[in-house]
């Protein structure tokens, strides 16, 4: 039997450094696989920040200017101004040749073809070409996570296909003859954890307890980067996964010092990791939350510090744990109090109603009072 930490270390040896391109609209949350270097100046022209009149600042000794043109945002009309002249400019419009100052419209008065400037102000109200981003500038670094803010930088540069680290494909198989009579829960819950962690779940269907059927399903699943199964890893006659993994590849560990989830098995087939979760729904979910996020997030170059974070709470009751086993206790949080929800590893509501888990270490047997809750 292996500790949780040792099992995690073994699984973290698997890596993935595959890169791909995704459309800009699909890049949110992905990790950049290369530096983003601007190929253009942004803005690409001297741009007005205000509605008003563009003039030459050296002409400010006079307060009356002759209106010689209009510039609108998106327009392609070219205007040049000389001594004592001005041009109307809209916000976002190109600055006319010769102008270096925009007087806000509220500080002026138009009289016929003339414009009177009452108060020019202290700011030029012009965004110069390249003041936001310059051609050749590295604007985002490799390893940066695309978020709701810097995705705007990519859009401003006109980037339509974004270089990112590829998501690992994760094959999911539930095993057991009983799945012909009951609903398959584990495939659904595991796929949600995979997606939340940054992977791409691939449903492979269910397998019966016939060893040939299980082998066929797993061989088919080796097209993916990771294989996950549930069921068939305890000590019953139909618990075939240890045999199947040994014959198709090799077992890395079997049984982990944790509850729930102790029967957990991991191996390697065709250089691909295979994680065999317990069939009991809460045990399966706990193993999924413990082992999948750190492994998958490493593969997509995302940081991992617990997906939901940690909250401090007070246990509603004293909890007894088995010495030498790390216990993951599902709890519901209400007004700073953590109420245990565990009713049995085979019952989905044991974790389905939980907001997080309290981890009780291998050296502890009793836990009470203030605790850290790993939010799910």
Which positions does each model-derived feature cover?
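Helix-rich terminal scaffold detector
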Residues: 1-4, 160-277, 281-287
């Amino acid at each position: 039997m292996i500790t949780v930490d040792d099992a995690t270390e073994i699984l973290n040896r698997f890596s993935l450094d595959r890169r791909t391109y995704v459309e800009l609209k699909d890049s949110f949350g992905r990790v950049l696989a290369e530096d983003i270097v601007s190929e253009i100046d942004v803005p690409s022209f001297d741009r007005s920040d205000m509605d008003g009149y563009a003039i030459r600042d050296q002409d400010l000794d006079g307060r009356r200017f002759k209106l010689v043109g209009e510039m609108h945002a998106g327009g392609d009309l070219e205007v040049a101004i000389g001594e004592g002249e001005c041009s109307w400019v809209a916000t976002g419009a190109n600055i006319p040749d010769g102008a270096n100052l925009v007087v806000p419209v509220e500080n002026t008065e138009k009289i016929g073809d003339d414009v009177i400037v009452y108060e020019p102000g202290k700011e030029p109200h012009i965004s110069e070409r390249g003041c936001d981003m310059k051609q050749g500038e590295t604007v985002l670094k490799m390893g940066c996570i695309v978020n709701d803010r810097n995705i705007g930088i990519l859009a401003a540069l006109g980037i339509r296909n974004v270089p990112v680290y590829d998501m690992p494909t994760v094959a999911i198989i539930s095993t057991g003859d009983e799945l012909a009579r009951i609903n398959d829960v584990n495939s659904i819950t595991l796929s949600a954890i995979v997606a939340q962690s940054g992977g791409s779940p691939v449903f492979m269907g269910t397998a019966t307890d016939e060893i040939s059927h299980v082998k066929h399903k797993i061989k088919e699943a080796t097209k993916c980067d990771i294989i996950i199964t549930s069921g068939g890893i305890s000590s019953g006659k139909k618990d075939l996964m240890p045999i199947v993994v040994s014959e198709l590849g090799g077992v890395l560990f079997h049984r982990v010092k944790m509850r729930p989830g102790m029967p957990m098995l991991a191996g390697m087939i065709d250089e691909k990791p295979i994680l065999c979760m317990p069939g009991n729904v809460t045990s399966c979910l706990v193993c999924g939350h413990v082992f999948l996020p750190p492994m998958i997030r490493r593969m997509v170059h995302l940081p991992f510090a617990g997906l939901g974070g940690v909250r401090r709470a007070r246990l509603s009751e004293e909890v007894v744990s088995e010495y030498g086993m790390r216990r993951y206790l599902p709890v519901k949080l209400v007004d700073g109090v953590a109420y245990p929800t565990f009713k049995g590893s085979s019952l989905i509501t044991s974790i389905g109603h939980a907001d997080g888990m309290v981890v009780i270490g291998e050296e502890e047997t009793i836990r009470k009072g203030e605790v850290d809750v790993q939010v799910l």
